Each structure stands twice: as C-alpha cells, then as structure tokens.
C-alpha cells in the first residue's frame, strides 16, 4: 500500500503547473475557444490559412470546369437539334411538298397509268374487273430488284423570266414490256403544284407517244427585211 501511494504521488502534477497546448495544430473551432475570439484566416495560424486558400482555389477551378463542361454539352445538344431539324425539314419537304420530286413522280405515274395509248404500248393485261399496275423506278443498271430501286433522275433550272422548270426521267414496266417516260414541268402561277408542260413515252420498237404536248409557240410575223412596216397595231 505504501509503495502504490508513493507511485501515485509521483504521477500527480504540481498544482501550479500550466497545460501547454500547441495551438498551431488545433482545428479552427478549438482554436477559437482557446483564444476567446472569432475564428478567421487573419487570426488563424499560417498553415491553416494557406490550406483555406488552397481549398478556395480548388473550389473555384471545379466551378470553372463544371461551367465549361455544361456550356460545351449545351452547344453540342443545340447543334444536334439544329441538324436534326434541318434533316427533318428536308425529308418532309421532299415527301409532302407539291413541288417535291416524290409528288411530281407520283402524278406522272398516275398520268401514264390513266392513258389508254400508253397502256396499249406497254401491253398491259387489263380485264373487265382488273387493271394491271405499272412498275415505275429510276435508272437501272441490271434486272434485279435492288438495282431498280434507285433515285429518280431529275433536274431543276430557271428560265430567263425566273420561273423554275422541272425535268424528270424514269422507267415504267409491265409484265411484257418496258418504256421510258420523260417529262417537263414548270412552276405554276395559279397553284402550288407544278404544271406539266411536256410528257412522252418511249417504248423500244414503237413510235414516241406524247401524253402531254407543249403548246405551240405563235411566231410573230415579220415584214420585209425582218421589219414590220406600217402603223403599230396593239
């Protein structure tokens, strides 16, 4: 017992001894309590203030990087949406526009199917209750189905007056014969649909058949030496 008491007495700290604390390694909240004043980087130890500045720089860089990433992603999304809108507009205008190649082609095929002379030249197998449908396709390089499914050959030009003209060429086929249809259409002043100016069918071994003939142009008569003599006539 005496030995244990002597050991405890030796471990007991003197009454007047002060507790030494390394405030430089204390966290911010404990440093505030120990010094009795609000905590800030001004009063904080140099090491802790430097850490705060590094954290602020890292946070600012993260914000800049996030903003740049968001801006780049937004630009990509807007660009993709713009390209998709243009493609959709071109597809819809091609399929449903009255002046599109698809609509002109469908009208031309219907005109050929409704012409009795053209059906006779193509030797359509028509009965009382049934009429043979024509197969129409673009320029072909073979007899198989895949090479026949090619785009229709068409061009567009402007005349001297600024009116647009459409030129198209495609093939028609029945179970017995084939032919080539060529047409010319021009922009109409009264309708959204171009009006057909010329359309004819060429069947091998047969005379060219005009489904639509162009209106003959009336030549203005000229007088002697190519001049019109006499008073002007309105």
UniProtKB/Swiss-Prot annotation:
Membrane topology: Single-pass membrane protein
Source species, domain of life: Eukaryota
Record InterPro entries: Tim21, Tim21_IMS_sf
Organism: Eremothecium gossypii (strain ATCC 10895 / CBS 109.51 / FGSC 9923 / NRRL Y-1056) (Yeast)
Subunit annotation: Component of the TIM23 complex, at least composed of TIM23, TIM17, TIM50 and TIM21.
GO cellular component: TIM23 mitochondrial import inner membrane translocase complex
Pfam families reported in the protein's UniProt record: TIM21
Stated name of the protein: Mitochondrial import inner membrane translocase subunit TIM21
């Amino acid at each position: 017992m005496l030995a244990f008491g002597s050991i405890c007495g030796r471990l007991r700290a003197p009454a007047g001894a002060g507790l030494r604390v390394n405030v430089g390694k204390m966290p911010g909240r404990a440093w505030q309590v120990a010094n009795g004043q609000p905590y800030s980087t001004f009063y904080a130890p140099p090491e802790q203030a430097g850490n705060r500045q590094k954290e602020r720089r890292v946070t600012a860089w993260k914000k800049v990087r996030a903003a740049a990433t968001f801006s780049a992603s937004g630009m990509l999304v807007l660009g993709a949406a713009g390209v998709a809108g243009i493609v959709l507009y071109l597809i819809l205008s091609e399929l449903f526009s009255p002046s599109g190649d698809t609509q002109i082609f469908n009208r031309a095929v219907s005109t050929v199917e409704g012409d009795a002379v053209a059906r006779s030249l193509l030797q359509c197998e028509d009965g009382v209750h049934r009429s043979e449908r024509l197969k129409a396709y673009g320029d072909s390089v073979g007899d198989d189905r895949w090479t026949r499914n090619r785009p229709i050959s068409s061009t567009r030009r402007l005349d001297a007056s600024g009116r647009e003209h459409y030129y198209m060429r495609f093939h028609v086929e029945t179970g017995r014969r084939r032919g080539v249809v060529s047409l010319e259409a021009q922009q109409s002043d009264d309708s959204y649909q171009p009006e057909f100016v010329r359309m004819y069918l060429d069947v091998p071994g047969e005379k060219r058949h005009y489904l639509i003939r162009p209106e003959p142009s009336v030549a203005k008569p000229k007088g002697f030496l190519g001049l019109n003599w006499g008073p002007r006539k309105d």
